[in-house]
Amino acid sequence: TERKALEERLEHRAFHDYLTDLPNRQLFVDRLRKALDRTRRKKGRKVAVLFTDLDEFKIINDSLGHEAGDVLLKLVAQRLRRCLRPEDSLARFGGDEFVVLIEDIEGPEVAVRVAERFSEELKRPFLLEGRELFAPSSIGIGLGDARTKTPEALLMDADTAMYRAKEVGGTLRVFDPDMYK
């Protein structure tokens, strides 16, 4: 019915980014919480969160305008999606922040490979209105397992690692507890 379709559209909008149609923060945190619960049932398995920030997005937005920035964000989302396995979850947290959940891994290697693919994809130029634009990124990786207290704690670890990557110039970093010192 029409009412049911409207309810479904409203629910979709509540949990997805309006621009990229990716899951939003609320849906991502829910998926991360469930993934962490699954690590408690699978001994030795981990989840990874990749926190990706576009290093020069503000410059693009300021010089070419918000419409061009929005188009670039859609293109970035498409490229990042192609780097993932079907079971991985990509979300946009707003602005130029993209976050990925990778489940059922043993260690950081798979997450590092995905982050390297992201980095390579974002180094390739984007063609926008006849211009070549670049969207270099900084990526932080946080690993969670049965001992991880909350999804928010794991997101904070990945975010901290991303800022460390940004400090050294557009690279990727795996979270280390020493980063909080």
Task: Briefly describe each language-model feature range.
Residues 8-48, 55-85, 91-100, 106-116, ...:
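Conserved long alpha-helical elements within nucleotide-processing catalytic cores of c-di-GMP signaling
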Residues 1-9, 180:
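Sensory coupling linkers of modular signal transduction proteins
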